[in-house]
Amino acid sequence: MVNLPDNVHEESFANNNASLISRLENSAFNKSNFEYLKTCINFFEKKSVNYTVVALPCSGDERKASKRPKRVNNHNMYILFNSFYTKIRRPEWPNSPTMWDTVKAHKELSDFVRVFDHTQKLGKSITSRSASSSSFTETNGKRRRSVITNVAEVQENCDQRDKLYSEFYSLLNETFKTGVAPATSNIYDSVITRELLTKNMELFKNIALKLPSPSYVPTPVSNKKRRAPPSAPKKIAKQRRDTKPPPTYVSDNTQDTNMSE
């Protein structure tokens, strides 16, 4: 080993300390609270307490958390679809989760999914009305939020939401059975119209359920042998009746009066 003079060691140590302090102050990865660190060090120095500074990794990556895309919550839409699909489902059709994934996978059925999305938003807007009744009061100079809950209003909003969903299910069921949406409904607005519901229900039948078109009516096939067409009834010839006079019979018994003895 090469023995370096003491002044070289001290200069190298000073350079390393300066580089370390610069890195701690300027590094983007350093999440330390320097104000809190300075306070602790001053306290330990004042009380003559030995201390150590330890570096620990953060629990999570903030960059990944900030860049993580927001996921669309389809849970409420699936609940509405499941309630509708369960009532019309046939035994040979897929279950509700599989059918819901099939519907979302087809771009042609995007408007059909939008019907459920818009309806769940309407129901959410009804239930959030009770939050608007909250008020703010000031106590001891501090603003404190006090929520005033009106039980009657909350119950009324829940009833309106249930009524909305019930009418929505009835609207879908009738459209599915008849092939045409009802002429009037409280559900209709600028988004959900009669034409849109009729068109997309037909697409749901053809693409997702793969049902035949209404114009095609399959003829039932019977395994029974066809019967021969009934032939014309045979005419029975009438027998000719003879108009001869009835026969006369002569008795064989003769009288012996003229015979001699």
UniProtKB/Swiss-Prot annotation:
A family per Pfam: Baculo_PP31
Region (Disordered): 215-261
Keywords: Early protein
Start-end of Polar residues biased regions: 250-261
Domain of life: Viruses
Name of the protein: Early 39 kDa protein
